[in-house]
Regions:
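Compositionally biased terminal segments of proteins
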Residues: 1-184
Length: 184
């Protein structure tokens, strides 16, 4: 796991030096808010807005090797840049632009995972929203772990409001109902 933290530290340092708005999301942040588990990569959201993605992707690809030959084209099409940190570990950088992502980055707080590894991370509520929205079996397990570990501390109204908006775009209203069951 230390190699993943080293990879995150390197990419976070690069982004912070440019004063970009970003935070860790995904499996590393599950350690803070949910049931800790193994993860093979570091995931971040980087606020790029719409139409400005290339201004962020190009400097990242000048510094870090893309995980695909068409890394820039893939990133611009799919809104996620797949790179390797210098230690060879995978880092996924999602390009943020939605109201939810802007809110998530404003709510992000610093967390010390271990000495020397302090990163901005999304809130428990925002991580729950992303996990429920993704909806894969492992994501639902993570959402359940967050709900259990943070029982009584989560802003359920915030979660359900943002999840409902995202699920409307994806046309998956049943996701909100599943999430509501975990939050009671």
């Amino acid at each position: 796991m230390n190699a993943i933290f080293e990879a995150a530290k390197e990419v976070v340092g690069f982004m912070a030096a440019r004063k970009w708005k970003f935070c860790l999301i995904g499996g590393l942040v599950v350690q803070r808010w949910g049931e800790p588990r193994f993860t093979k990569d570091a995931d971040l959201t980087l606020l790029t807005g719409l139409g400005e993605e290339e201004k962020f992707a190009e400097p990242l690809l000048e510094r870090f090797r893309g995980r695909r030959a068409d890394a820039l084209a893939f990133a611009l099409t799919n809104r996620v840049l797949l790179i390797y940190a210098s230690n060879g570990k995978d880092v996924d950088i999602s390009f943020g632009a939605l109201e939810f992502e802007v809110s998530m980055l404003k709510r992000a707080t610093l967390f010390e995972f271990a000495p020397g590894f302090v990163f901005p991370t999304c809130s428990a509520e925002d991580l729950f929203v992303m996990k429920a929205f993704a909806g894969r079996p492992l994501d639902w397990l993570d959402a359940k772990g967050i709900a259990e570990r943070q029982k009584g501390k989560l802003n359920t109204r915030y979660i359900l409001r943002h999840l409902a908006v995202l699920c409307e775009l994806k046309e998956t209203p049943e996701t909100v109902q599943e999430a509501r069951k975990l939050l009671v």
